[in-house]
């Protein structure tokens, strides 16, 4: 068992660390404070081949593996979790299901748009009355001739008001429960598509989150993703992969907070010496480091398993659960080390703590992750 990254993965980490330091970190505070979508940096990430990087080269992607994508999200999130979130959603929740379940015609049309075409992707599953219980969605798609007519709405959609391509889940047969859910590829230009409420959130201010509304929206029949009635399975499989992205995001937040706290405590002198020299902060740092290392191993393991094409549902849930809860603990403890300064916007700690919280909620709450893990333990 080799725990060393390949040369390719090392180069990807180096590239993303440099990009994050030079392009992402300098605008992270302003992105949060002014609720700005980091458009220029996302365009640069398209140019670097990070957006849609796991898409095969014949469709415009880099042909990278899931571990490479996780490393990119991790590095970006050390400075700006919003940027990491945008990439994670695009790569894991839009490109991936189209690549995995799309027809050759769908892949040939949409994957180049999501790579070299600089079109942003999104994933529409959650509804006002269907959060953790995704089977209770009310959005409907009725077949009329050569197209479907879709009505309903989705909420909390990451990339919502900037995305061009959406993977949407709707009921095609309400009498069949989860077996009546189908998946569709939807474009923001389709008649009847509109963006509703822009969410005002506690954190991730640079990640555009919105309600998406479908009013008699026309969806061509050929835009059904996978077979009719298989949408729920597609959603669950996609979320497995998406959880690796959120684990990487949360890991990056924790690592970034740890580094900020280390640097601050080395320079902050109290009672005649840097506070990093006191035993209590050192014990806290040890716990932070331990948690980050464990989270990294869990996340990379899940990513490698996905790349090998074997089942990784439990491993993805474990990585997401551990990293998200560790990010919340680490940012809270790191902020405490800054004292009163940590509570101000002069330092990034309060932003990191606000950003960390959502990782315990979206892509399946911590409670849902525990359900998934226990369900895959043969109990």
Question: For the regions a protein language model found, what residue spans apply to each?
Answer:
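A short core secondary-structure module
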Residues: 146-147, 151-195
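Alpha-helical interface subdomain recognition
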Residues: 1-89, 101-106, 113-118, 131-134, ...
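Short Gly/Pro-enriched turn/cap motifs at secondary-structure boundaries
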Residues: 114, 129-132, 156-159, 173-175, ...
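A short, Trp-centered hydrophobic/proline-enriched beta-strand micro-motif
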Residues: 117-125
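Flexible, glycine-rich active-site loops centered on histidine and acidic residues
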Residues: 95-101, 123, 135
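Flexible, small-/acidic-enriched active-site or ligand-binding loops
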Residues: 136, 189-220
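Short Ser/Thr-interspersed hydrophobic loop/turn segments at strand-loop and sheet-helix junctions
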Residues: 49, 73-77, 170, 186-191, ...
């Amino acid at each position: 068992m080799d725990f060393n990254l390949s040369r390719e993965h090392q180069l990807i980490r180096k590239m993303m660390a440099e990009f994050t330091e030079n392009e992402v970190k300098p605008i992270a505070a302003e992105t949060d404070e002014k609720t700005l979508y980091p458009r220029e940096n996302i365009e640069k990430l398209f140019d670097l081949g990070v957006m849609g990087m796991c898409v095969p080269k014949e469709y415009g992607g880099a042909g990278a593996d899931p571990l490479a994508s996780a490393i990119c999200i991790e590095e970006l999130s050390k400075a700006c979790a919003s940027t990491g979130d945008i990439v994670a959603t695009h790569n894991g929740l839009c490109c991936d299901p189209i690549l995995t379940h799309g027809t050759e015609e769908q892949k040939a049309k949409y994957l180049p748009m999501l790579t070299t075409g600089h079109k942003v992707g999104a994933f529409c599953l959650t509804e006002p009355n269907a959060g953790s219980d995704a089977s209770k969605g009310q959005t409907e798609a009725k077949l009329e001739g050569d197209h479907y007519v879709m009505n309903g709405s989705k909420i909390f959609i990451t990339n919502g008001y900037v995305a061009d391509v959406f993977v949407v889940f709707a009921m095609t047969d309400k009498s069949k429960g989860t077996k009546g859910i189908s998946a569709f590829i939807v474009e923001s230009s389709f008649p009847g598509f509109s963006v509703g409420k822009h969410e005002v959130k506690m954190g991730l201010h640079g990640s555009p989150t919105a309600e998406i509304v479908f009013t008699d929206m026309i969806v061509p029949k050929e835009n059904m993703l996978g077979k009719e009635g298989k949408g729920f399975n597609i959603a669950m499989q996609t979320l497995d992969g998406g959880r690796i992205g959120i684990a990487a995001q949360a890991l990056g937040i924790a690592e970034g907070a740890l580094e900020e706290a280390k640097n601050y405590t080395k320079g902050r002198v109290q009672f005649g010496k840097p506070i990093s020299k006191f035993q209590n902060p050192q014990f806290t740092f040890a716990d932070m480091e331990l948690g980050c290392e464990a989270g990294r191993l869990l996340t990379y393991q899940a990513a490698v398993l996905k790349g090998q094409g074997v089942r990784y549902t439990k491993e993805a849930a474990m990585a997401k659960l551990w990293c998200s809860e560790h990010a919340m603990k680490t940012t809270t403890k790191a902020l405490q080390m800054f004292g009163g300064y940590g509570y101000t916007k002069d330092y990034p700690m309060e932003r990191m703590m606000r950003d960390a919280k959502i990782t315990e909620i979206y892509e399946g709450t911590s409670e849902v992750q525990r359900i998934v893990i226990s369900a895959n333990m043969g109990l």
